[in-house]
Amino acid sequence: MEQAHTKTTEECLAYFGVNENTGLSLDQVKKNFDKFGPNELPAEEGKSLWELVAEQFEDLLVRILLLAAIISFVLAWFEEGEETVTAFVEPFVILLILIANAVVGVWQERNAEDAIEALKEYEPEMGKVYRSDRKSVQRIKARELVPGDIVEVAVGDKVPADIRLISIKSTTLRIDQSILTGESVSVIKHTEVVPDTRAVNQDKKNMLFSGTNVGAGKAVGVVIATGPNTEIGKIRDEMAATEQEKTPLQQKLDEFGEQLSKVISLICVAVWLINIGHFNDPIHGGSWIKGAIYYFKIAVALAVAAIPEGLPAVITTCLALGTRRMAKKNAIVRSLPSVETLGCTSVICSDKTGTLTTNQMSVCRMFVIDKVEGDVTSLNEFTITGSTYAPEGDVQKNDKNVKAGQYDGLVELATICALCNDSSLDFNESKGVFEKVGEATETALTTLVEKMNVFNTDVKSLSKVERANACNSVIKQLMKKEFTLEFSRDRKSMSVYCIPAKASRAAVGNKMFVKGAPEGVIDRCNYVRVGTTRVPLTSAIKDKILSVVKEWGTGRDTLRCLALATRDTPPKREDMVLDEATRFIEYETDLTFVGCVGMLDPPRKEVMGSIQLCREAGIRVIMITGDNKGTAIAICRRIGIFGEDDDVSGRAFTGREFDDLPPAEQREACKRASCFARVEPAHKSKIVEFLQSFDEITAMTGDGVNDAPALKKAEIGIAMGSGTAVAKTASEMVLADDNFSTIVAAVEEGRAIYNNMKQFIRYLISSNVGEVVCIFLTAALGLPEALIPVQLLWVNLVTDGLPATALGFNPPDLDIMDRPPRSPKEPLISGWLFFRYMAIGGYVGAATVGAAAWWFMYADDGPNVTFYQLSHFMQCTEDNPDFEGHECEIFESPVPMTMALSVLVTIEMCNALNSLSENQSLIRMPPWSNFWLLGSICLSMSLHFLILYVEPLPMIFKLTPLNVEQWFIVLKMSFPVILLDELLKFVARNYLEG
């Protein structure tokens, strides 16, 4: 049923053809069940494991590697002799890499789908329903409820479906609907019509929503929506419809992969074509097919050389290390790639309650009446420090600390706060914090009494558990609470009836203490308290009191004000009818006004500094809240989102005002605004969409079920540690301490991680460029193979992987939070950098080929062939006069390969040192600025020695141990790469950067 909140109860009952007392007939139940289905959220149609695995192989680079593995497997099948073992190592290793990558990918995808399942925990198990087959109420499974059912709910129940209230069977009905609307206090419901067809869920006071909790009272209503049609069901649909976007880094790596795969394909084809003339060379036994297969192998080697197989593992490791560092700062990261996205966050949309504020109501101002002379009324105004529930803070008058017990008015005010109150403080020993037990507003009064300590109780020697309610207990020993007149909407107040405790023997009679909305309470006051006397309330005094209340309620702080009053001579208990709430207002008359307190949910202390940090880092902060606009703007001013005197027109909107704008202006509003109040979940998603259309990278915080769709849609969803499981599973990050400042620390960490990733991605890619150049040169010049696929895999995975991982530990730049966020479109490798890699890669390739050629042509223990003989080695036969005096076997010696591989590895170690900083010289950033890197270089070299000197590894890798002279040549050929890169850095620093 649509718009049920705008219909009368009779219209709702008539719509479903149901009688309030008997409920639906079994025929109607069956018909509605067939029509609307069970009252549960449909299970998420997740992808099957097979589909998830298949998805991991959609990446082009992965497919090229897979193809390379299949080809080398087929070729290995036809090998004979001792080659066979080596031949099978390569396809086996490639497959292992692919499997490992797929496992990580599938695991992350699986995590993403848990969010929708977590909604299930808000589904109630049972419901209490009236149906015509039984006289009394019956308990049935909640999934069997249908629209039209008459349902009963009572305190402690979870609301089983969306319900339109028909009648309330208690004084009040309070519902905690914070999971759905984000309201920090429970809401009082009624049964009257809410005529506004565009009311937000917060304003539908005659509706109960599925999954919310009944805090107090008992009521009967008619089910108007079940399952997917409920408000919580709509949230599920929205989440299911939200596609996860790829992070900026993932998009870049995808683009890079596509370009790389095109380049690889071109080079492979080119190598093949260049050598078509050699297919018939004698070395292949004159068989054209064998020649084709030989060059096919080289093409496979090229593919393996060009793909940085170690990259996914190194990225995952770096992100995982980043998440550990963030966890120490209270930011728990749930999805690894989002660590890097945090670094380019340009807008943070933050919830107000609990994130920017403490979500601990606290009284910050109060007044009692000082004196009344004729028409002139003077007040004693006080401010109170401390912004949490901890009973620590001072009472100040004119910025000087005062003792509250010296003011008679404050003693009575404290008495009312302590007695007219059902809440208390509790010290949670495991968390080490003071927490509320009961309503936030009342707990603020309890805390106020502790701070005032009007009877000078000795609290210094008490433990924290005893301290929590020490001063309140003293007051409760003087007066005993007999009964409470519950709060009701019509009178907007509550009261308690108290009698003096026997022990106190005080000369006071019975009293009624009242607290409530100032306008309503003052209307029922006939007197005001001045010191210990009471003075008749004149219109001048009343105007003075109301003007201060209005100023507090609408001024800079927009405080929530409560008036406190006493009925000095209440009626006798036996004359009061306590089961008729409508008569309570008669007993709360002839009151004496005592004072007024103003409270707010205060901003966290550290938030102001964080917002300043965001401003310097070029990040915009937008506050989004379900609270009203006045309160929201006041908090924005207090924390520095708005200046004290800023004009906020066009910069702060309510959800309704935002909806009233045409789409073009809504777009503009999202560009300018810094505050959205009275917002529904759908607005949050809309705001994220508009921000994304300006290419902003948005972080969105939330804690309720209602926030889940927006959390899922934003690039970075941030849930609160104290929030609902749904919010946590829909988000990328969870704040363990619910603190806004933690987000800013996480953004800083994200920026540092991205800078380091850029360094090691570039490092790994320059290594691959070198390998490709090496293979291309040997093939183009017709030289013997310098590197084979097994060796390339070893270098890419192991020897390069270790320093690359260590580069993730580079210390962050000092000015990292003074720069604007990087654009997500900024390429990983710009034009100049591309040239640098080509230059370095070209040198790496030339040096490796050079090392192999050196052994053939110049080494003392080498064959000393000429360059012509080397480049035509394929035509070597015993009867070819060009090769007289040389055995053809020398061209298959493992020494030149070992030389080439050693040069490659050593150059890569030098390159790792070059990567310590993008443009800083090694003189400015010495190697010991990153000890992890030095350690990993030593480890990589040790592993290289391992495959040269420890049997049977040299056989598998087709290598042989080198002597001292050969190592000398290796070092001579490797070190110039440092000089070359220093030169390129010098050019970048002095001619390109400014």
Curated annotation (Swiss-Prot):
Ca(2+) 2 binds at N768, E771, T799, D800, E908. SMART domains: Cation_ATPase_N. The keyword Magnesium applies. Keywords: ATP-binding, Calcium, Calcium transport, Disulfide bond, Endoplasmic reticulum, Ion transport, Magnesium, Membrane, Metal-binding, Nucleotide-binding, Phosphoprotein, Sarcoplasmic reticulum, Translocase, Transmembrane, Transmembrane helix, Transport. Ca(2+) 1 binds at V304, A305, I307, E309, N796, D800. The chain crosses the membrane at residues 49-69, 90-110, 254-273, 296-313, 758-777, 788-808, 829-851, 898-917, 931-949, 965-985. Inhibited by sarcolipin (SLN) and myoregulin (MRLN). Also shown to be inhibited by phospholamban (PLN) in vitro. Enhanced by DWORF; DWORF increases activity by displacing sarcolipin (SLN), phospholamban (PLN) and myoregulin (MRLN). GO terms for molecular function: ATP binding; ATP hydrolysis activity; calcium ion binding; P-type calcium transporter activity. One of its GO terms (cellular component) is endoplasmic reticulum. It is a multi-pass membrane protein. The active site is at D351. Its main location: endoplasmic reticulum. Its EC number is 7.2.2.10. Residues 70-89, 274-295, 778-787, 852-897, 950-964 are lumenal. The keyword Ion transport applies. Disulfide bonds join C876-C888. It is an enzyme of class 7 (translocase). Belongs to the cation transport ATPase (P-type) (TC 3.A.3) family. Type IIA subfamily. Ca(2+) and ATP binding cause major rearrangements of the cytoplasmic and transmembrane domains. According to the E1-E2 model, Ca(2+) binding to the cytosolic domain of the pump in the high-affinity E1 conformation is followed by the ATP-dependent phosphorylation of the active site Asp, giving rise to E1P. A conformational change of the phosphoenzyme gives rise to the low-affinity E2P state that exposes the Ca(2+) ions to the lumenal side and promotes Ca(2+) release. Dephosphorylation of the active site Asp mediates the subsequent return to the E1 conformation. PLN and SLN both have a single transmembrane helix; both occupy a similar binding site on ATP2A1 that is situated between the ATP2A1 transmembrane helices. This is Sarcoplasmic/endoplasmic reticulum calcium ATPase 1.
